[in-house]
Amino acid sequence: DVYKRQKQIEHELATGNFLIPSTVTVAEFLMDWLPKQCSKHKWAPKTYQSNLALIQNLIIPYIGEMQMQKLRPYHIEALYDTLSKTPCGQYVGGKRRDLSPKQQKRTLSGTTLHEVHQLLHNSFLLAVEWGILIKSPVPVEAPKKTTQERSIWEVEEMRAALDSMEDPILHLAVHLTLVGALREGEVAGLTPEDIDFDAANGMGTFTVNRSMQRVQKDTLAQVDKGCILRIFPDKLEGSKTSLILKDTKTEASCRTIFMTAALREELKQWLERLKREEALDPERYRN
């Protein structure tokens, strides 16, 4: 038996298939892989946060204790099968939650399973490069994404929605969103410097190049802060999250949008109001 094992090792060394035995688990590997990839690719805070959530809530609870070298494709397929029947939010921050009967009926989407597959695919390829695995156990075929058709509001629906809003801040935020197809963080990240009333022959434009986000403080300690323009002071003592202002993700996300006449007028009135408020309380607008 010793002789056979010696010959087997010699053959594996000759063919480049020798693997140093390792007891590293899936959880240990992924929690080592995550910060390294974040640093290498300069992930944005939300990218790090979403990948951490996938690992903590959808991978570690099910296969985290398994040793990497004992993992086989059928284990990954079994994980996908389990996740397809798992309620959304079953685990948060790596801790299991008790869900109501209604909550238990809403299971994870195919898109979420696809994201888990992509993370495992990318990370386990690196495990091969690192010499932990000879071959990735992640199946070639990924879970099918869930396709949902988005409904687009008609002009009448947009007008009705705006007419129903009495709060001027909410009205302006929704108006900007509808005209520019903005995300929530992009609306919050707009400043007076982004607005040009004279552009486009007086039609007016506004430029989207920043986004406001709320992220975990643990995340901020891990990510590259090059894209972060400002971290706002906490309003509540002991808060576990921070409000940040950051650059948009890509050059494509940075865009200039034409105003409608109604939006142009509303923005002018809003900026005039801000100037009046600033004159009455300069300290509020200095921070």
Give names to the regions the model predicted.
Residues 69-84, 95-100, 139-143:
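Short, conserved phosphate-binding/catalytic loop or strand-edge motifs used
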Residues 76, 120-124, 187:
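Short, basic/aromatic-rich helical patch in the C-terminal catalytic core of site-specific tyrosine
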Residues 125-134, 269-272:
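Arg/Lys-rich amphipathic alpha helix in sigma70-family domain 2
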Residues 1-78, 93, 274-287:
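N-terminal DNA-binding module of tyrosine recombinases/phage integrases
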Residues 31, 70-73, 85, 134, ...:
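Phosphate-coordinating loops and pocket residues in cytosolic domains that bind phosphorylated ligands
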Residues 142, 157, 190-276, 282, ...:
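Conserved tyrosine-mediated DNA breakage-rejoining catalytic core shared by Y-recombinases
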Residues 89-119, 129-190, 200-203, 252-254, ...:
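Basic, Lys/Arg- and aromatic-enriched nucleic-acid-binding interface segment
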Residues 56, 121-124, 128:
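C-terminal flanking helix
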